[in-house]
Amino acid sequence: MKNYLSIILITCSTTFLLSQTRFSNQDVFEIQYVKDPQIAPNNSQIVYVRTSMDIMTDSKTSSLWKISGDGTEHQKLTSSTANESSPRWSPDGKKIAFVSSTDDENGSEIYIYWVESKQYSSISQLKQSPKNIRWSPDGKYIGFTMFVEDDVLKLVSPPQKPDNATWAPAPRITDRLKHEADGSGYMEKGFHHLFMISSEGGTPIQVSSESYNHQSFDWSKDSKKMIFTSNYSENWEYEFRNSEIYSIKVDGSDLKQLTDRNGPDRGPVVSPDGRTIAYLGYLDKVQTYQVTKLYMMNIDGSNKREIKTNLDRSISSLRWAPDGKGVYFKYDNHGNGKIGYTSLSGKTKKIADNLGGTSIGRPYGGGSYSMSKTGKIVYTLSTPYHPADIGIFDGRKVQRITNLNFDLLSNRDLGTVEDIWYTSSVDGRKIQGWIAKPPEFDKNKKYPLIVENHGGPISNYGDRFSPEILLYSASD
C-alpha cells in the first residue's frame, strides 16, 4: 500500500509541474493584491484594500476586506460594489472610517462602518474627493485634506452660445508655474486644504484658509490642533523642495510655524504623550538625491534635533512605538523594502524585510504598514514571485496570512530572479542588478538578453513582483 501511495504522490507531483504554464499578458487581469492594511487597536482584526483588475473596463477596482490575525474569517467588509479605500480604525476600535466612490465622476465620500452592527453609511456630502483621512484622538472628528477650486481666470467675455450649439472647448488660462503633471494632465486651479467632520456626520469644517497646499498632518493629543506640512513662502512655486511644519487650532486660529530652514520638513507625527513631534526632512543642498532624515522637536517647535540613525538611507512613513520610546519607519536597502525601528538615542534595528508589492508593473518600491496599540505590525509583504499579501510581525517573527493569487500563480512557472553585482569599468564602483531567468532555464543554452538600465536610489528597482519583467522573461 505504501508503494502504491508513493507512486500516486510522485505522479501527482509530476503532473502538477508539467501543468504549469508561463505567465502571460492575460494573467495580468487575474492579479489581486493587498494595499493599506490596518490593524485594529486591540489586534482583533485587520482591514485592508483588495485591488483587482477589471478586464471589461481595463481598470483597477478596490474593495475593503477584513481578516483575523490568524488568517481566518477572511471576508468582504461591505456589500458595496463601489471602489473603497483608506480604511482607518477609530481609537476605541468600534468604528472604521473609509472612503468610497460615488456615482459622480471621480467623486467620493467618507463612510463609517460600525463593527458591532456591521452597518455602514456615508457621513459626508463633499464637493471634491477627500484624502488623508485621520481620526482625532478623542474619536469625535475625522480630519482630511480636500482640493478647493479657485476662480477660473478670464481674459475676455465670450459671445453668447446659442442653444444646442457645438463649440470648441473654452481656452484654459493659468497663471501657475506648475499647471500640468505626468499621469494626471492639466491641473485645475486651487489648493488642498485641511478639513474636519464630525464622526457622526454633518457639515465639513474648513480649518486652513491660506492659499497654499496643505499636505500630511496629525492631531495634537487633546484633539484641539492639527500639525501639518505646507510652504507659506511667497515663492512657493519656485521652492518646490521646500516645506515647513505648522500648527493650527481646529477653529482656524493660532497658526504657528514650527520649522524654518531651506529644505523639506514634512510628515509630522505626534508622540503618544503629546509632547513631541517626529518628522522627516533634510537641509537642501540642491542635489539630485539627498538622504531624508529623522528629526524631533517639542510640540511647540522648540528643541529641534536630528536622531542620528547612522543608516545612510532615506526613511519614510513614521510611526511612534506605543510606549513612546522609539519610532518605526520604512526604508529601502539594496532594492528591498524594510521596516526599521530606532530608539530616541538613535539605536536602529531592522524589523521586517520584503515590504512592497503594491506597484504593479515595474519593480518599484512602495508598500505600507500599520501598528496596533500593543505594537503588533501588519504590512504589505511581497517577493518577485507574488504581489503584496498581508504579513504580520508579532515582535518575534513574520507570518504571511494571505495568499490572494494562489490559484493563479501556483499554476505558473515564473522562472527565477537572482541578485547580481558587478564592478563599473569607469570608477570601480560596485553596481547592483537583478537577472530574471526564463521558465525552464537551461544554463547550457543561449538566450536573448534585454538590458533595462535604471538608476537609484530615486525610485529604485528591486527584487519585487513585476508583471513587466515576468512577461519579458517568459517571451520566446
Show the residue positions of the predicted features.
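Bacterial Sec-dependent N-terminal signal peptides
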Residues: 1-23
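Beta-strand-rich domains and repeat architectures in extracellular enzymes and scaffolds
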Residues: 26-62
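Conserved beta-propeller blade repeats
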Residues: 31-46, 81-99, 120, 127-145, ...
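Short, solvent-exposed loop/turn segments at conserved positions within beta-propeller repeat blades
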Residues: 56-61, 103-108, 185-190, 236-243, ...
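Predominantly five- to eight-bladed beta-propeller fold
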Residues: 61-62, 147-195, 229, 240-244, ...
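A short loop-to-beta-strand structural motif that recurs across blades of beta-propeller domains
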Residues: 63-65, 109-111, 193-195, 244-246, ...
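Short loop/turn segments that connect beta-strands within beta-propeller blades
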Residues: 68-72, 114-118, 198-202, 249-253, ...
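Serine-hydrolase catalytic core recognition
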Residues: 364-476
